Regions:
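Acidic, serine/threonine-rich low-complexity disordered tracts
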Residues: 24-115
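Contiguous hydrophobic, core-forming segments of folded domains
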Residues: 1-29
Length: 115
């Protein structure tokens, strides 16, 4: 019937929902967090590195943020076209996604919190 059965190593998130997963974690600068992602019919290990504290200015205001850089656990590019992602979450209890940046070999997409 075309159905496949896959073993799932615990909780698995899609590439977008991992941002919301991170919002509920006690994130510490310099620490790394591991989770599994389901994307393009594959389950992949993703390592999320908390790399910096930065002040980010967007239309919604100025925020103290944690800079988060997810990488693939297998060393392969995380996104299509050799893409990389960076996420800036507000460094407070809300953990708002203030800025998300995706770079690929065809360009860069930047999303910023408006209000």
């Amino acid at each position: 019937s075309g159905n496949k059965i896959r073993n799932i190593p615990g909780r698995v998130y899609d590439p977008i929902s991992f941002v919301y997963y991170l919002r509920n974690q006690d994130l510490i600068l310099g620490h790394s967090y591991k989770f599994f992602s389901y994307d393009r019919k594959k389950i992949r290990e993703v390592i999320v590195n908390i790399t910096a504290k930065e002040t980010v200015q967007v239309s919604a205001g100025t925020f103290n943020c944690l800079k988060i850089e997810p990488v693939s656990g297998d060393g392969k590019p995380l996104l299509k076209n050799n893409g990389q992602m960076r996420v800036w979450l507000s460094d407070d209890s809300l953990r708002l996604p203030v800025k998300i940046e995706q770079k690929t070999n065809i360009g860069t997409m930047v999303m910023k919190l408006k209000k």
